[in-house]
Amino acid sequence: MQTIIRVEKLAKTFNQHQALHAVDLNIHHGEMVALLGPSGSGKSTLLRHLSGLITGDKSAGSHIELLGRTVQREGRLARDIRKSRANTGYIFQQFNLVNRLSVLENVLIGALGSTPFWRTCFSWFTREQKQRALQALTRVGMVHFAHQRVSTLSGGQQQRVAIARALMQQAKVILADEPIASLDPESARIVMDTLRDINQNDGITVVVTLHQVDYALRYCERIVALRQGHVFYDGSSQQFDNERFDHLYRSINRVEENAKAA
């Protein structure tokens, strides 16, 4: 099975607090993987490293590859990092859309990386690009909102627009950082259904950070659980049982309670 993402010896320190400890991870083509863990476990930090939004510690000897290209090595971004990012759709918890633009215009932003610079200056997109954007919106059930300003949409609708933008980008990997954290249950279900659909039908590799264990078990065949910056569990979601859940979350809660008592 083809390895799409390779992480070796990744360590990260913030203000003398080590957020990640020598993390090793391989993710294969077509997988939908959930990164689980309590707050502060390092799951979002790990995800941001995968696209080079942040860099690891320079002394750790770390190396991250995505689609066969080096993203970063020993805390330094690769010179051709833009080529890696061009194939990676990143979905943020807070949507990261341009509120003053329409839904269609936000999706077209996904084509900027493959559009000549002079066209981007004037927002001149081709008819073919606009058709692809409408097709992406159709995939996520948002085509009827194409000409509506994105600021008028609900949180779940905005997240689906962000997914459509990744489709417009023709991303081969989607990294989704807490995409349902602020959504109601119905909106969360629709967003996760959408991610699973493009994973299964388009073969796009999806890595998603989640707090909600039930969604991870329902939608992802593989779970990578982090605990205090270490990989605590990496395996089938079917084998992530109550005992592992208890050790991952409740032991952390006991540590926090003891710290407060002290």
Curated annotation (Swiss-Prot):
Q: Which family does it belong to?
A: Belongs to the ABC transporter superfamily. Phosphonates importer (TC 3.A.1.9.1) family.
Q: What is this protein called?
A: Phosphonates import ATP-binding protein PhnC
Superkingdom, natural source: Bacteria
Transmembrane residues, as ranges? none
**NCBIfam families, per database record:** ABC_phnC, PRK09984.1
Q: How does it sit in the membrane?
A: Peripheral membrane protein
Extract the CDD domains matched here: ABC_PhnC_transporter (cd03256)
Chain sites annotated for binding ATP:
G37, P38, S39, G40, S41, G42, K43, S44
